[in-house]
Regions:
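RNA-interacting cores
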Residues: 1-277
Length: 277
């Protein structure tokens, strides 16, 4: 799995939606399409979303337009992209070609951000499990949910709270769909519920409704599709957890920085930063 960290900068100020991940996703597809149309189409069609896109991270100005903010001129913005499918080395290389070798920009609806710097990191599922096994038994996972995290519980019902079962079961599904068969994790709801305690920071908690797609109406037009989710900070501590459960949950937490948490991660949702204490 790979993670790409881009630093972006705009020459002029321009508006972007409050939930800018959807626009960034479209810009990424456009950039991929200029290099390899088949890869772009596969990303668009993938049920996993294939990539995790953090959306723009940085300091924004206010906007007169409803539900918008403004990119500041000459202000640095971060963009994190994660690729977790082991078959997607091609995708990673295509992104490198688009943004580094070809000097491409992120072209949004109202303006452009140029790529100023680029860093990449990689890991395997096995390496994350090895790192997790080195963590002490009293460790705490500190998770910052940077963008709206939309976890579907049943049908179209989404959770609006960073509950331990919801968060780590979401990550477990992503892990087992992308890991080699011999590294699949078998950890049930009861094990997570009985071994992990979540401690959210009420001062940082917020809820959101964000645009993630546009779908066709019966009359040939389109309508916006929204997802509901939460942002904030939450610590996850262990209580009487077995070593296997502790290692699995810790590895899943680290995996979340590559995969994102919940649904619509390719469109800017579920971007997290994880620390260990």
């Amino acid at each position: 799995m790979r993670r790409i960290e881009l630093t972006l900068r705009a020459d002029r100020s321009f508006p972007v939606p409050d939930s800018d991940g959807y626009q960034v996703y479209g810009a990424l597809l456009d950039a991929l399409d200029t290099v390899d149309a088949s890869v772009s189409q596969r990303v668009h069609d993938s049920p996993l979303g294939t990539i995790h896109n953090s959306g723009l991270r940085g300091s924004f100005a206010g906007s007169d337009r409803p539900h918008h903010k403004r990119v500041r001129a000459n202000e640095p913005y971060g963009l994190s992209l994660g690729v977790v499918d082991r078959d997607d080395e091609e995708l990673f290389e295509t992104l490198v070609n688009a943004f580094v070798l070809d000097g491409d920009d992120i072209r949004l609806a109202e303006g452009t951000l140029r790529v100023e710097s680029f860093e990449s990191s990689n890991a395997t599922h096995e390496e994350l499990l090895e790192r997790a096994s080195d963590v002490g038994s009293n460790a705490t996972l500190d998770v910052e949910f940077h963008t709206a995290t939309c976890i579907e519980e049943a049908g179209e019902v989404t959770t609006m709270f960073p509950h331990r079962v919801s968060v780590f079961r979401s990550l477990l599904g992503k892990w087992n769909r992308t890991a080699p068969e011999e590294l699949a994790l078998d950890i049930g709801r009861e094990a997570i519920a009985g071994s992990v305690i979540e401690k959210p920071d009420p001062r940082a908690y917020d809820t959101h409704s964000v645009l993630v797609n546009r779908v066709e109406n019966g009359d040939g037009g389109t309508r916006p599709l929204f997802r509901q989710g939460f942002t904030g900070q939450c610590s996850y501590a262990f209580k009487n957890a077995s070593e296997s459960v502790r290692n699995a949950v810790t590895a899943l937490g680290m995996f979340g920085e590559y995969s994102g948490v919940g649904s619509a991660v390719a469109r800017g949702c579920g971007s997290v930063e994880v620390g260990l204490e």
